Curated annotation (Swiss-Prot):
Plays a role in neuronal plasticity and the proteolytic action may subserve structural reorganizations associated with learning and memory operations. Belongs to the peptidase S1 family. Residues 30-87 are annotated as: Disordered. This is Neurotrypsin. It comes from the Eukaryota. The keyword Hydrolase applies. Disulfide bonds join 93-165, 109-149, 138-163, 195-259, 208-269, 239-249, 305-369, 318-379, 349-359, 412-475, 425-485, 455-465, 525-589, 538-599, 569-579, 619-750, 661-677, 765-831, 794-808, 821-850.
Length: 875
């Protein structure tokens, strides 16, 4: 993060999200040690606070735009003519929040029609197709990346920035059940409340509709006194009651002061509990427009069996939920298996009913199904780029049509191939397809939108294929593309293979292997995963060099389903699909076993002297720290991103030493760590080794090297019964300046200046290590952003135990606490200097407890020991 973005995030109140964990990550980091700590005082620890932090400023006002008109039932495409565009939602936010109109750092988006023709900085590709549209909602024009928008910067210039798709999300907290509670909204990277001034049932109804808890809401109020430290974002919310999202309502940005009656907005979502309109919801989808159908009956939620489930049934579900667009039925627990009872079976709607209760069906609770047959629906909004097959006997066949600028249009068949058909059918949720004669279906009278389409077969969406500009063609409707799609045979094997991608690697040639099957990206289990399997993956991706397999979630754990297990390639197959012998979806794995590959692998290990001259004179240099997707605040670090991070390991008789403490590489032969790391096992050099270049503790890597210890120097003032002077130096075995071999993954950290005050000079601070994540010991190097705290703050909490040779750091906000528990004892607290060099300002030392409220972690202040370090190491 640049200094400018850091300051901007601070001003907008987003700092807790920038420098800390979110609530999920906070659950995954609690302890510092990878193994049980030695006897003695526990470290680090926490204390409660009695000081209220200043309230963060709310985000700037959001521009208002009229809500798009809701389609009436008569205007809705009939289920037999409608297709489906699978997840993620085209062009918009993957979370389904289509109305986000502010960047992730709080800048209001410009309307796409207001963007000038000349820009100082090139935006992502394909944005020109949005030029002229009068809305300002965040979009991903190519359909593959993260949504973004243009905004006006402080200099009056137009720039672009990514959007946070969670902005405008709502939740109910503190109620007796899921249908009631205080309204909390997500903005500027954190959850906040709404002042209850002018809060009425129309506002409450929009909240209930957005949460899929029915269309009727009752406005309530909650005292702020019981909510803890949480900001107020909005006041005077003024909804009509039919908006799809609270972002579309008029409202005022909270400017501080006192909220009338000191009450926060709350709601109770009320359903009509008569027989005509049972309570329904969609669960397990990637947006509010899709998911497993669940009904609330007799006091509990249950599912619907998919026997005879079709698009007509889906049409009724979408109508009952108030969702317009294209309705499609999904079978065989496509959105995951539910729990609880199966409520209904044999549902047979005509598509014209107002409620599923009006459809012919089994009696409540009567069925012959399991949850593997749970029914689902998708209600795809009509946005530009949605496709369908129209004019056939069902949604699986017909004339290919694309929705653009409020109108359905066709596609010309010039240059149409089998690969094009495959991409269309896959996007619509089918396994196979073939081009059909246009004479089989009624001729269109609308526009011809696309021509000269060419797909490679790897695309996940039809609009990712190359094509002419919208409306440019030399065709007539006699040349309209028509397609018939088929679900495929048992086992879901594909004749053409399926798309493969590599995720979270350092470059495009390596990463976690993900495959696109059944409309979803998923991973491969590493059972039996070998270099032969990796060779096939790399060949399918177009790489011809040597390939190496990586196991045990080497590139991080994926999300979504695990599609494939027990891959058995010979190494000569043309695609992964030719290697699969086991049915898709069958496995006995977790995401901790996700498979990965490195393509064009030629062995990157540097020799001992090859780069000595170029690297021995530098420090604090991160050669591998940027990637498109930032991973901060307690997640896996980028491999090689912290090249000075090393581990002090305890040797065993078996030769497989375990991790004891973290440490920091200061030069080729010297390592900095904590003195207490040697308290239990003594300071005999025979007991220890130091590992450099490590990332995944269980996978041997090309830059990894384990070096013996020649000398251990503990500060002479350190006492085992005290936490002061908790610092030590370790001399590695080897000739002078030739102990550890430098490379892009092994480099020394800089030392701070003597008596430097890091609270004034340092910024952008991180802790790193392989510490206990709270659920299991981390296999991969972790990192967490962490703020330095004022000296007086630490002295008040630790009284006389905190000395001038110590620092304390941590995020003390509730649910976002971060301290040295997230690193290893002896590990580094690194801060960025001006000019992008990094210095070690702290050594993880002690604290009160772990994750305890208002008790920051304590670190040995390295700047206080610079003369001692230099006298020992001769640096």
């Amino acid at each position: 993060m640049t200094l400018a973005r850091f300051v901007l995030a601070l001003v907008l109140g987003a700092l807790p999200e920038v420098v800390g964990f979110d609530s999920v990550l906070n659950d995954s980091f609690h302890h510092r040690h990878r193994h049980s700590p030695p006897p003695g005082p526990q470290y680090p620890y926490y204390l409660p606070t009695h000081q209220r932090p200043p309230r963060t400023r709310p985000p700037p006002p959001l521009p208002r735009f009229p809500r798009p008109p809701r389609a009436l039932p008569a205007q809705r495409p009939h289920a037999l003519q409608a297709g489906h565009t699978p997840r993620p939602h085209p062009w918009g936010c993957p979370a389904g929040e289509l109305w986000v109109s502010v960047t992730d750092f709080g800048a209001p988006c410009l309307r796409w029609a207001e963007v000038p023709p000349f820009l100082e900085r090139s935006p992502p590709a394909n944005w020109a197709q949005l030029r002229g549209q009068r809305h300002n909602f965040c979009r991903s024009p190519d359909g593959t990346g993260r949504p973004w928008c243009f905004y006006g910067d402080a200099r009056g210039k137009v720039d672009w920035g990514y959007c946070d798709c969670r902005h405008g999300s709502v939740r109910l907290r503190g109620g007796k059940n899921e249908f009631e509670g205080t309204v909390e909204v997500y903005a500027s990277g954190a959850w906040g409340t709404v002042c209850s001034s002018h809060w009425d049932d129309s506002d409450a109804s929009v909240i209930c509709h957005q949460l899929q808890l029915g269309g009727k809401g009752i406005a309530k109020q909650t005292p702020f006194s019981g909510l803890g430290l949480i900001p107020i974002y909005w006041s005077n919310v003024r909804c009509r009651g039919d908006e799809e999202n609270i972002l579309l309502c008029e409202k005022d940005i909270w400017q501080g002061g006192v909220c009338p009656q000191k009450m926060a907005a709350a709601v109770t979502c009320s359903f009509s509990r008569g027989p005509a309109f049972p309570i329904i919801r969609l669960v397990g989808g990637s947006s509010v427009h899709e998911g497993r159908v669940e009904l609330y009956h007799a006091g509990q939620w249950g599912t619907i069996c998919d026997d005879q489930w079709d698009d007509a049934d889906a049409e009724v579900i979408c109508r009952q939920l108030g969702l317009s667009g294209i309705a499609k039925a999904w079978h065989q627990a496509y959105f995951g298996e539910g729990s609880g009872p199966v409520m209904l079976d044999e549902v047979r709607c005509t598509g014209n009913e107002l409620s599923i209760e009006q459809c012919p069906k089994s009696s409540w609770g009567e069925h012959n199904c399991g949850h593997k047959e749970d029914a689902g629906v998708s209600c795809t909004p009509l946005t530009d780029g949605v496709i369908r097959l129209a004019g056939g006997k069902g949604s699986h066949e017909g004339r290919l049509e694309v929705y653009y600028r409020g109108q359905w249009g066709t596609v010309c068949d010039d240059g149409w191939t089998e690969l094009n058909t495959y991409v269309v059918c896959r996007q619509l949720g089918f396994k196979y397809g073939k081009q059909a004669s246009a004479n089989h279906f009624e001729e269109s009278t609308g526009p011809i939108w696309l021509d000269d389409v060419s797909c490679s077969g790897k695309e996940t969406r039809f609009l990712q294929c190359s094509r002419r500009q919208w409306g440019q063609h030399d065709c007539s409707h006699h040349e309209d593309v028509s397609i018939a799609c088929y679900p495929g045979s048992e086992g879901h094997r594909l004749s053409l293979g399926f798309p493969v991608r590599l995720m979270d690697g350092e470059n495009k040639k390596e990463g976690r292997v993900e495959v696109f099957i059944n409309g979803q990206w998923g991973t491969i289990c590493d059972d039996g995963w070998t270099d032969k399997d990796a060779a096939v993956i790399c060949r399918q991706l177009g790489y011809k060099g040597p390939a190496r397999a990586r196991t045990m979630a080497y590139f991080g754990e994926g999300k979504g389903p695990i599609h494939v297990d027990n891959v058995k390639c010979t190494g000569n197959e043309r695609s992964l699909a030719d290697c699969i012998k086991q049915d898709i979806g069958r496995h006995n794995c977790r995401h901790s076993e996700d498979a990965g590959v490195i393509c064009d692998y030629f062995g990157k290990k540097a020799s001992g002297n090859s780069n000595k001259e170029s690297l021995s004179s530098v420090c604090g240099l991160r050669l591998l720290h940027r990637r498109q997707k930032r991973i901060i605040g307690g997640k896996n670090s980028l491999r090689g991103g912290w090249p000075w991070q090393v581990s002090l390991r305890l040797k065993s008789s078996h030769g497989d030493g375990r991790l004891l403490c973290g440490a920091t590489l200061l030069s080729s032969c010297w390592v900095l760590t904590a003195a207490h790391c040697f308290k239990r096992y003594g300071n005999s050099t025979r007991n220890y080794a130091v590992r450099v270049g490590d990332y995944h503790t269980l996978v041997p890597e090309e830059f990894e090297e384990e070096i013996g210890v020649q000398q251990i120097v503990i500060h002479r003032e350190y006492r085992p019964d005290s936490s002061d002077y908790d610092i030590a130096l370790v001399r590695l075995q080897g000739p002078e300046e030739q102990c550890a071999r430098f490379s892009s993954h092994v480099l020394p950290a800089c030392l701070p200046f003597w008596r430097e005050r890091p609270q004034k000079t340092a910024s952008n601070c991180y802790i790193t290590g392989w510490g206990d994540t709270g659920r299991a010991y981390s296999r991969t190097l972790q990192q967490a952003a962490i703020p330095l705290l004022p000296k007086r703050f630490c002295e008040e909490r630790y009284k006389g135990r905190f000395t001038g040779r110590m620092l304390c750091a941590g995020n003390l906000h509730e649910h976002k606490r971060v301290d040295s528990c997230q690193g290893d004892s002896g590990g580094p607290l690194m801060c960025e200097r001006p000019g992008e060099s990094w210095a070690v300002y702290g050594v993880t030392s002690w604290g009160y407890g772990c994750g305890v409220k208002d008790s920051p972690g304590v670190y040995t202040k390295v700047s206080a020991f610079v003369p001692w370090i230099k006298s020992v190491t001769k640096l």
